Amino acid sequence: MAAFSVHILGCGSALPTTHHHPSSQVIDLRDKLYMIDCGEGVQRQFRHEKLHFGRLIHIFISHLHGDHCFGLPGFISTLGLLGRTGTLHVHGPEGIERFLSPILEQFCHRMPYQVEIHTIDASRHALVHEDKSVKVYSIPLSHRIPAVGYLFEEKCRARHLNKAAAEFYNIPLAEYPLIIEGSDYTTPDGRIIPNRHLTTPGTPPRRYAYCSDTEFCPSIVPIIQGVDLLYHEATFMEEDRARAKETFHSTAKEAAEIARQAGAKRLLIGHYSGRYKDVQGLLEEAQSVFKPTIAANERMRIDL
């Protein structure tokens, strides 16, 4: 089975702490890396995880609060120093171009590669990127400024060849790749053997949803229904719910309720407020509602 894993580079919130880095994750899917959010310190975390800079082609920014995007200027500059030549694509909500363009002009105008900026309508659920491995959809979130989550949906994987059937019909080996991709087979005498008689369905595609930052927002549930893994911010505990409401963030219990309603297979919480020195309370609060909950931590890798 092809790799589909999530690397946690940072899971803290706005205020810097000695125990968590600002938000950033990297998805490793087949032959590519996809970054979600790019807080300060991301370059060191990227190296700690032994991730290859050259495999990263797309960066997705959730919103323009500093703890989610202040790592971008340094990261973009470093890629140039490393001799990158392939285009880097940066996706984000309205304002992403105003944020990046002056930086690119001032510090990165002689780089050996191009940066393409793609503005996303944070109010719409839409397909924002597609390649041979994945489709990426926007998830409208509810925060103090335009914020967007991301749903990564693996492309349908190839069907499994029924070797006994292939041998029965004397199908040449050269035809196997086409059959695995879904083609019927025509025998030398002109008979058409339907693909369903020659293959079985491939493994269901895996799905990962990233939802941060946002207040409790049940409207996202239909979009993320049945995901294999849901990352949902859990900035506060229920005892600080008033502060969560004031700042348009979620509690751990609310994150778990979203996971429960969506029928997610697993929940990953993060974006912890700096007031909590230990995240065990946040984890237990979430698990009281949705048992298969994991507390994110730096340098953690979760396989889907």
UniProtKB/Swiss-Prot annotation:
Binding residues for Zn(2+) 2: 67-68, 213, 271
A Pfam match: Lactamase_B_2
Gene3D superfamilies, alphabetized: Ribonuclease Z/Hydroxyacylglutathione hydrolase-like
Reaction(s) catalysed (UniProt annotation): Endonucleolytic cleavage of RNA, removing extra 3' nucleotides from tRNA precursor, generating 3' termini of tRNAs. A 3'-hydroxy group is left at the tRNA terminus and a 5'-phosphoryl group is left at the trailer molecule
SUPFAM superfamilies associated with the record: Metallo-hydrolase/oxidoreductase
Active site, per annotation: 67
EC number of this enzyme: 3.1.26.11
Domain of life: Bacteria
Residues that coordinate or bind Zn(2+) 1: 63, 65, 143, 213
Name under which the protein is recorded: Ribonuclease Z
Organism phylogeny: Bacteria, Pseudomonadati, Bacteroidota, Bacteroidia, Bacteroidales
